Amino acid sequence: MTHTALPVATVVFGPEAAVATGHALVLAPVTPSWDEGAFFAPVIEVLAGAGLRVTVADTLSLWDETVDSMAVFTARWRELLPGFGPVDLLCGNALGGAVAQALLPEAGPATAALLVSGPTRTDALLEARLGEIADLAASGRPGEALALLNRRVLPSGSASERDAGPTPDADEAAGRRLAAGMRLLRGIDLSPAVLGHPGPLLQLVGERSQLVTRRHTAAAPHHEVHVVPGTGMRPHFEQAAHVSALIRAFLREKGLQ
């Protein structure tokens, strides 16, 4: 595991560039602090196992108080993208998935995309649920915000959702990240970037997700959206074997293994 010198928190997994079969760039979801790729561990294992060099980036590293929209935020990522070098597979989870979709026009026509619970567009219900988390975080209650987020990422109606544990610890910095990340997703519609992408794309969403669902995605005829049975926002953990098999098949089909 290595780190890059880019002005964003990153960690790199997999073989050295000289022997890798390709390069995957993974953009992180909203997390209370940078977890160095733990959020995507099962997928990283699959990608690295297929011979890809995997760079995982903390998406919110490029956020500050002057960023007030997804357009401004993705403009920053657009400027940074060339610094990662050639990207064969652009990946993103949740907020990172949204940013990855916004970057598709800059990624190149042959670049493959792998998205997990990455919204292409929002609607009133999704924005209300994200806004509730953001408002708690912004009002000095980051622990409550994180507890609500932890419930919302679970499958709807699950026992663990009904029997939530104690409010987790979260400091002011975590609250700023939570509020910023949730609010960046307000009013987005990245459909033109997705529908216009000529490369392959696989989007995975949970059948019982309380947040990002099939209706929040877009896909061209040559793309694939797969709804993972029984899962919430983290199908790659909840149905790891099933999701890993889908990703391996996608990599083989697209010549990335």
Please give the residue ranges for each predicted region.
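Conserved acidic catalytic loop of the alpha/beta-hydrolase fold
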Residues: 48, 70-88
